[in-house]
From Swiss-Prot:
GO terms for cellular component: cytoplasm. The lineage of its organism: Bacteria, Pseudomonadati, Pseudomonadota, Gammaproteobacteria, Enterobacterales. The active site is at 364 (cysteine persulfide intermediate). PANTHER family: CYSTEINE DESULFURASE. The keyword Transferase applies. InterPro entries: Aminotrans_V_dom, Aminotrans_V_PyrdxlP_BS, Cys_dSase_SufS, PyrdxlP-dep_Trfase, PyrdxlP-dep_Trfase_major, PyrdxlP-dep_Trfase_small. It comes from Escherichia coli O7:K1 (strain IAI39 / ExPEC). SUPFAM superfamilies: PLP-dependent transferases. Pathway: Cofactor biosynthesis; iron-sulfur cluster biosynthesis. This is Cysteine desulfurase.
Length: 406
């Protein structure tokens, strides 16, 4: 299949709009990606003609909605090559998925004196839940330090493991630096020390294929909204043996087998015991449409196109005076930068005047900002619908800002 970015862009209605009188150049997909018509229409069609509460309903609409929901679980399992659809839990997003693991598996398996390993490049969603768990139980949080080029000091990792290490929680791809971590060797090392591994895949699954069986990770979590799907829906993968042992962390409808005021409550089996309450069925339907859309394009095709675009962007940005880039040469999805001594917010505001949308701030990665000794960065992210012309506009915009501000 020949990849046509023009055909892809035609599926995204928002990309035809203007901002400040100029065509929108949306370079903020790492924060949240735009949605194709196929996703918008699938969710709207469900609410127009197919909506009902799922599970236990005897009527046709409920049965059909349940079938559609569970078919998305199956599609998602194929998308990441899980052994079974029953290894996947629907969550609100990556953040909830990590908190679920921390509050269910973590509360049951991490004790005083144990330790958890994370890295200095993590998103707050893969830091704060582990800080909270360690504070609750008296465990230690250990950190893999960064190199200046945005890679991890992996030579330090063996020294962080010991017989008390219970978990390695690591990002697949940094949301700021674009660094893709060498998961295979990290996971092997963790398992050699008897530790489990959680992978934050929020910035990976849209850029290339992910195979959780090949990785052999114990947990893998990602969000739908960065994968061209709706907000408020994501996937937590857990190896089946682990998932069946984990207790629920939220109580309510749908996650019970029996409820008795005198004899207490028993839980239904996983994954449904982790899905208390009425689910975001519309979001699940939209996620299914997003998975179908991306799969039809082919993740390998997307990866090839995006990597060519990334190489072009990095080469063109070399022409911008006083531009500092953060992260390795080989990266996925994002380019973080600062322009001279100007605050990222000012640079981002000027770019917005030119119709260019980038993200500014600490990117939910304050420890990483502290490492580079900056309060904030600009971040341009490249997705499957971005073009070489949009990269040229970014470069021209930065050159113009440099001339204006000095």
């Amino acid at each position: 299949m020949t990849y046509s970015v023009d055909k892809v862009r035609a599926d995204f209605p928002v990309l035809s709009r203007e901002v400040n009188g100029l065509p929108l150049a949306y370079l903020d997909s790492a924060a949240s990606a735009q949605k194709p018509s196929q996703v918008i229409d699938a969710e709207a069609e469900f609410y127009r003609h197919g909506y009902a509460a799922v599970h236990r309903g005897i009527h046709t609409l409920s049965a059909q909605a349940t079938e559609k929901m569970e078919s998305v679980r199956k599609r998602a399992s194929l998308f990441i090559n899980a052994r079974s659809a029953e290894e996947l839990v629907f969550v609100r997003g990556t953040t909830e998925g990590i908190n679920l693991v921390a509050n269910s598996w973590g509360n049951s398996n991490v004790r005083a004196g144990d330790n958890i390993i994370i890295s200095q490049m993590e998103h707050h969603a893969n830091i704060v839940p582990w800080q909270m768990l360690c504070a609750r139980v008296g465990a230690e949080l250990r950190v893999i330090p960064l190199n200046p080029d945005g890679t991890l000091q992996l030579e330090m990792l063996p020294n962080l493991f010991d017989e008390k290490t219970r978990l390695l929680a690591i990002t697949h791809v940094s949301n700021v630096l674009g660094t893709e971590n060498p998961l295979a060797e990290m996971i092997t090392l963790a398992h050699q020390h008897g530790a489990k591994v959680l992978v934050d895949g929020a910035q990976a699954v849209m850029h290339h294929p992910v195979d959780v069986q090949a990785l052999d990770c114990d947990f893998y979590v990602f969000s739908g909204h960065k994968l061209y799907g709706p907000t408020g829906i994501g996937i937590l993968y857990v190896k089946e043996a682990l998932l069946q042992e984990m207790p629920p962390w939220e109580g309510g409808g749908s996650m019970i087998a029996t409820v008795s005021l005198s004899e207490g409550t028993t839980w239904t089996k996983a994954p449904w015991r982790f899905e208390a309450g009425t689910p975001n069925t519309g979001g699940i339907i939209g996620l299914g449409a997003a998975l179908e859309y991306v799969s039809a394009l082919g993740l390998n095709n997307i990866a090839e196109y995006e990597q060519n675009l990334m190489h072009y962007a990095l080469s063109q940005l070399e022409s911008v005076p006083d531009l500092t880039l953060y992260g390795p040469q080989n990266r996925l999805g994002v380019i973080a930068f600062n322009l001279g001594k100007h605050h990222a917010y000012d640079v981002g505001s000027f770019l917005d005047n030119y119709g260019i949308a980038v993200r500014t701030g600490h990117h939910c990665a304050m420890p990483l900002m502290a490492y580079y000794n900056v309060p904030a960065m600009c971040r341009a992210s490249l997705a499957m619908y971005n073009t070489h012309e949009e990269v040229d506009r970014l470069v021209t915009g930065l050159q113009r800002i440099h001339r204006l501000l000095g």
